[in-house]
């Protein structure tokens, strides 16, 4: 009899990468989400609001071998899953690498200056690195609270996946920072700290691989999720330019800061240790950033032909609201040339 996977909030970019992996290995897949979505043939869809526990219980029917939760944002969501433990064989819940804090208590969310940014070891290991205090102060503390609930119980095997900067077709992705510049035919790109900044990305393909392996091998644990050979900011800009066949002049500044702040810019490296994932579930990456980013770039080009990018990616629009001030960039570059 086929095993059953219930993907809660599974219509997004990672869910869509996960579905063929599960289906190809004989899993029956059911996707639960609030809206109506077109899914691949053979995949059942249940319209359900995860805030309604009774409705979620009904959606689970006779139960599921694994529930993958893409939309756990509050500790109450973890408690809700435990309420339904009789219907769930195991859990895989998407968390975030932003729960990590350094030994001095510095966090991602609270860092307003370079000096306040966490000083992490390279790489960051799940077992030894402290995390933020669980609470409701922000996204990271809420994720930490979810982890606390699920790791503090023995009713259900629960894998918490601390993902890096997720990218893939169909999502609100950081790659738009460079893709838009290419579409606007910018002749140069300005990068601070000579493009050495490193903020670990993870493709939806690699993340989906880790999720299905965690479903295959249930357990109570935390696993990092990041691409192999985490690229620098310069590597990322070059990979995206290569994917879209664009040539530009790289202006590599020795210091970080405006006007060259990007979604990956950070004063100290954030690199995730993937040893635990390999040891616990036999994880091996299926792609690299250079290979995987091409599909993301192609999707961005096509998707933004039909809709304004601000509508397509509202969260990224808020984050990048001042990122495409080309007039300021041009003035900065002219001043730089004059100074030389």
Predicted region positions:
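N-terminal Rossmann NAD(P)H-binding glycine-rich loop of SDR-like oxidoreductase domains
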Residues: 5-25
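Glycine-rich Rossmann NAD(P)(H)-binding loop
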Residues: 8, 168, 191-197, 223-231, ...
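NAD(P)H-binding glycine-rich loop region in Rossmannoid oxidoreductase-like domains
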Residues: 35-93, 99-102
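Conserved Rossmann-fold NAD(P)-dependent oxidoreductase catalytic core, especially the SDR/UDP-sugar
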Residues: 80-144, 151-152
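Conserved beta-loop-beta element that borders a ligand/cofactor-binding pocket
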Residues: 144-169
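Substrate-positioning beta->alpha
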Residues: 173-178, 191-213
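A short C-terminal helix-loop "cap" of Rossmann-like NAD(P)-dependent dehydrogenase/epimerase domains
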Residues: 179-192, 245-251
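Mid/C-terminal beta-alpha module of Rossmann-like enzyme folds, strongest
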Residues: 210-269, 274, 294-295, 307-340
């Amino acid at each position: 009899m086929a095993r059953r996977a219930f993907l809660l909030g599974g219509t997004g970019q990672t869910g869509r990468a996960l579905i063929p992996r599960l289906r190809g290995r004989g899993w029956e897949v059911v996707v639960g989400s609030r809206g109506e979505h077109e899914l691949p043939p053979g995949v059942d869809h249940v319209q359900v609001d995860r805030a309604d526990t009774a409705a979620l219980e009904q959606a689970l029917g006779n139960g599921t071998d694994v529930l993958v939760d893409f939309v756990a944002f509050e500790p109450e969501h973890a408690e809700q899953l435990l309420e339904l433990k009789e219907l769930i064989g195991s859990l895989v819940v998407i968390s975030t690498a932003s729960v990590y804090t350094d030994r001095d208590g510095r966090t991602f969310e609270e860092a307003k200056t370079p000096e306040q940014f966490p000083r992490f070891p390279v790489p960051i290991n799940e077992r030894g690195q402290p995390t933020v205090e669980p609470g409701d102060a922000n996204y990271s503390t809420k994720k930490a609270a979810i982890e606390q609930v699920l790791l503090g119980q023995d009713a259900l095997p629960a894998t918490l996946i601390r993902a890096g900067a997720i990218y893939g077709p169909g999502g609100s992705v950081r790659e738009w920072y460079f893709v838009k510049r290419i579409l606007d035919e910018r002749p140069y790109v300005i990068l601070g700290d000579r493009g050495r900044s490193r903020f670990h990305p993870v493709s939806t393909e690699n993340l989906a691989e880790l999720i299905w392996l965690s479903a295959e091998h249930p357990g109570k644990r935390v696993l990092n999720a990041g691409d192999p050979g985490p690229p620098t900011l310069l590597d990322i800009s070059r990979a995206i330019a290569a994917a879209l066949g664009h040539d530009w002049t790289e202006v590599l500044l020795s210091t970080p800061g405006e006007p060259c702040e990007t979604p990956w810019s950070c004063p100290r490296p954030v690199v995730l240790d993937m040893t635990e994932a390999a040891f616990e579930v036999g994880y091996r990456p299926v792609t690299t950033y250079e290979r995987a980013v091409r599909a993301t770039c192609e999707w961005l080009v096509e998707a933004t032909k039909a809709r304004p990018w601000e509508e397509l990616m509202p969260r990224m629009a808020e984050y990048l609201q001042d990122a495409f001030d080309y007039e300021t960039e041009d003035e900065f570059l002219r001043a730089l040339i004059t100074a030389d």
